Amino acid sequence: MKKRNPIYTAGSFLLAGALTLSMAACSGAQAPAEATQTPSATATPAATAAPAEETTPSAPVSGALPVKALQPKQVEENPYMAKSDANIHHDGYNTDSTDEILPLGIYPEIHVSYETTNANASPAIYFDSYGHAVVPLLGGIAIRDLNAEETKTLGYFSPKQHDGGSYLIQSSYTFLDAENRIVCPTSNNHVLMLRATDEEGNVLPEFEKVLDIDIKAAAEAALGKELTQNLLSVVFDYDGNLWFATGGFRIYPERQQQGVLGYIAHSAIEAILNGEQTDLSKAVFVYALTPGEGAENGIAASKDGAVILTNRNCYLLRANNGVEAVWCTPYESVGAKVSGEGDKTTGGGLAWGGGCSPTLTPNLVMFTDNADPVNLLALDMKTGEVVAKTPVLDDLPDGYQVAIENSAIVYDDGAGTVSTIVCNWFGAGNAGLADPNNDSSIQSYANIYDQNWLLKGNAMIAPGVERVDTVKTDSGYEMKSIWTRNDLSDTAIMKLSTATGYIYGYVQDLTTGMWQYIILDFETGETVFTMDVSNKYGYNNMAIGMYTGNSGNALYCPTGYLELLRLQDRFVYLPELPYREVDLDQAARNVLAQEQFAQDGGEGTVASWRNTA
């Protein structure tokens, strides 16, 4: 497919000046965005737009969403993780929320970076502390310019080219550490640490491998028996120990595969990074799982320890000269779900057990089980006790099942309410995962996803998005449903921006076939903005998520057409040179804390964001 010009739904000029406050940040109430945008969930649907490659700029319109800022997320900083949205779930708590500013429909534009090297548009994006985008590339990992017309590689690591290996980097659970090193599990059961920048933050053309540990071999030595599961996920705890879990995206208990949970001691990692010899037999500790039990998701970590959800249980683990299981809480599952007679889908779910990675708050662990109906559970962080539980998405139309596979959004307001947004994923999973010879740890589209969904779009997945609040009371906790959207089918791993107060997604209008960016009101669940992309099937983003840029003005969405989309606001213009457009990739919006404002010499109270161009 050929490259094309940016897609516009509005003109290029704003009623705000460069280096001033954006009008969205200053105004208390503004009209919803117009043109191809839908003002609310109950309003008349937007007119069908032409396919993206045929779209041309339309006449200017005014309007933007009012800011509904929330308190920043309650995530204590991990001293061993990068101070950025450093993993696929944005932080070590797996909140799938960001404190970054995201677009508000201020003369919105969609820009495209076209992929000419990789087999797909970047399916995962993490940012280091310098603002570099770290993405998968040809089975390896790279730092790339995602805003260039053609996605440009600045530096990379190729297992085949640089390490003589046939393995792949497993990108889903790769992350950035506090020194901006890339920490990544591999398909051959190793964990690597890669140095990608120099001391000044300049990108190295070829990344340096500074650590390489065969986790499977070390774990087998510690366990004293063979492991028949593969390495799935890794994360640092708050003491710098590297936790790992074996498993896959679907683990059948009856197959009796042997798996483990465990960690590599921080002291051993530091010794290796310092060029010293270390005895891994004294530094790798494991917790043997019952045969048939394994992880199916990522690991969360807080000062309390590492939280791991297997297909059977939820664990809180600590490093204490060995793996200390602080608590283990079992949960319900009816097993892997697949489409049956009378269903409107052909695929199924993904996991055998709970499908979403566990998410933490300072006091709770949140996850969904895989019962029928599916339940949202809240566990006490200290004891593992189930303190609240409620069915979710239990009133869908006939012909649809429920599988919560995408990580839930969890937002703790710091005042006793934890809001969880769950999204149905059923139908997107490959029914072939039930094949006894299938390796569900292989992270490829062909292995994981239903072919009919890839070709026919979101008509082939079940709908359902719901917000449930867990509220602290005098007697404990109670859960209540706040809103439900049974008309939305989303597989894009929705994101919450605390800076704007909105939920961001990517859906397909099943009437027009149009793939769209969508913004929901966090409080009401109403659709307050849509922006059309294309009605061609290849604009399915294939459940690989959306990613928030660190400029305060970019929401990235990969597609199947080798195009990485980014939604941006034209929030700034040059009043004395109106014929010249400001490069939106050189404009930024950041939440300015009162403390930082005072340190920078500001007087008075911060009224808005800091906008620069």
Language model regions located:
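Blade-level signature of beta-propeller repeat domains, shared across WD40, Kelch, NHL, RCC1
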Residues: 541-613
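Loop/turn-rich, solvent-exposed surfaces of beta-rich toroidal or solenoidal domains
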Residues: 409-536
